[in-house]
Amino acid sequence: MIAVLFLAILCLEVDSTAPTPDPSLDVEWNEWRTKHGKTYNMNEERLKRAVWEKNFKMIELHNWEYLEGRHDFTMAMNAFGDLTNIEFVKMMTGFQRQKIKKTHIFQDHQFLYVPKRVDWRQLGYVTPVKNQGHCASSWAFSATGSLEGQMFRKTERLIPLSEQNLLDCMGSNVTHGCSGGFMQYAFQYVKDNGGLATEESYPYRGQGRECRYHAENSAANVRDFVQIPGSEEALMKAVAKVGPISVAVDASHGSFQFYGSGIYYEPQCKRVHLNHAVLVVGYGFEGEESDGNSFWLVKNSWGEEWGMKGYMKLAKDWSNHCGIATYSTYPIV
């Protein structure tokens, strides 16, 4: 059913009389298909090829403009090459902000000094990059990432936690599983449930199933959670003093879909209407510290092929770019 829906959307965005394939791109197209194991029927291939060519040429144009100094980041073809932007956003994001329950508020005024650079990966707080697959479950990966970091702070043991446990067991009244969710509700579930399973004991499947949680496989707990005021200054202090922080961003753009490297800045990015959850694991700047070269170090959940081995540098101190500070939270363990 989902595949049929996506194909219908694709047909709306790419006319059924798709243009004749560009023969000069035959080699690139076939290499890309082989690399990602893509197979299509005859009608579908024509549509998918048209989408892929459109994306390929968009990436090439952007990178020429990058060489001319018009952008600070590159784009790169990846596994999402045959997805329209509408398909991509529906399939690969998953943040749905809901009513915020009463919670603690981060007291950023308590911290007067923060370092100029932070990277929690170097201190052992961050698990390897994961892949949510074709499931809009970014909220679950963002939540487990922050919880993994806080459990490491407490126990000095870095244990990957189970996103599938969240997908299967939270209930449809608080999450929509592969159709989106909310990190704070994930923390509330772990608190109420008394634990969260390890990834090893409850591996990721990328679709909702019957809950199979067993308390003996739990490796984390939550006592409460904290909301961070919606400013980059408060977020910076939280990242510096607490550890990896769950945040949401606007990932609606082709430039985000095919981000390659460098400091990401998208003029059309919104500070509200956020749709994708990620994990801020640090911040810093490129070259000499100056205006315009600061970034947030963001861990995504689209595998290591995307971006900088699964990470992004997102523009920092640019009026809350892409809404990175609009909604941010972390658990108390």
UniProtKB/Swiss-Prot annotation:
GO biological process, one term: proteolysis involved in protein catabolic process
Cellular compartment(s): Secreted
Tissue: Sertoli cells.
Record-level Gene Ontology MF annotations: cysteine-type endopeptidase activity
Main location as per UniProt: secreted
Active-site positions on this chain: H276, N300
InterPro entries in alphabetical order: Papain-like_cys_pep_sf (IPR038765), Pept_asp_AS (IPR025661), Pept_his_AS (IPR025660), Peptidase_C1A (IPR013128), Peptidase_C1A_C (IPR000668), Peptidase_C1A_papain-like (IPR039417), Prot_inhib_I29 (IPR013201)
GO cellular component: cell junction; extracellular space; lysosome
Disulphide linkage map: C135-C178, C169-C211, C269-C322
Keyword line: Disulfide bond, Glycoprotein, Secreted, Signal
SUPFAM superfamilies, per the entry: Cysteine proteinases
Positions bearing the site annotation: Ancestral active site: S138
Signal peptide segment: 1-17
Glycosylation site list: N173
Family affiliation: Belongs to the peptidase C1 family.
Protein name: Testin-2
Source species: Rattus norvegicus
Protein encoded by which gene: Testin
